[in-house]
Amino acid sequence: MPKLEMMLLVLLILPLSYFSAAGGQVVQGDLHSDVLARYLQRGDRDARECQVNTPGSRWGKCCLNRMCGPMCCPESHCYCIYHRRRGHGCSC
């Protein structure tokens, strides 16, 4: 089989693996959400305490403590301050 025909065959078959047999819906594995859910279920962690810095997106960073700019503070009693020339940072 020539290379072009083989490539077209692969391009035709490859997208089929992304559809479920039930209704042709795209199957999207959401590994990040699954890992986060398992993490939050351990111990006394609760998803309601999770502060996501990108509302409406399931790919945002989750902080169980206070958020400070793009990062999570390491402890619950920390607060966020702004350092001139260095940006936001946690003060504990």
From Swiss-Prot:
Main location, first listed in the record: secreted
Disulfide topology: 63-72, 68-80, 73-90, 78-92
Subunit structure: Hetero-, homo- or pseudo-homodimer (identical sequence, different post-translational modifications).
Any one of the GO CC terms: extracellular region
Tissues where the protein occurs: Expressed by the venom duct.
Protein biosynthesis among keywords: no
Domain observations: The cysteine framework is XX (C-CC-C-CC-C-C-C-C).
Protein name: Alpha-conotoxin-like Rt20.2
Propiece residues: 25-45
Family note: Belongs to the conotoxin D superfamily.
Keywords: Acetylcholine receptor inhibiting toxin, Disulfide bond, Gamma-carboxyglutamic acid, Hydroxylation, Ion channel impairing toxin, Neurotoxin, Postsynaptic neurotoxin, Secreted, Signal, Toxin
GO molecular function terms listed in the Swiss-Prot or TrEMBL record: acetylcholine receptor inhibitor activity; ion channel regulator activity; toxin activity
Chain positions with 4-hydroxyproline modification: 55
Subcellular location: Secreted
Highest taxon of the lineage: Eukaryota
Function noted in UniProt: Alpha-conotoxins act on postsynaptic membranes, they bind to the nicotinic acetylcholine receptors (nAChR) and thus inhibit them. Through its two C-terminal domains, this homodimeric protein would bind to two nAChR allosteric sites, located outside the nAChR C-loop of the principal binding face and at the adjacent binding interface in a clockwise direction. This toxin specifically blocks mammalian neuronal nAChR of the alpha-7/CHRNA7, alpha-3-beta-2/CHRNA3-CHRNB2 and alpha-4-beta-2/CHRNA4-CHRNB2 subtypes.
Modified residues (4-carboxyglutamate): 49
Gene source species: Conus rattus (Rat cone)
Signal peptide per UniProt: 1-24
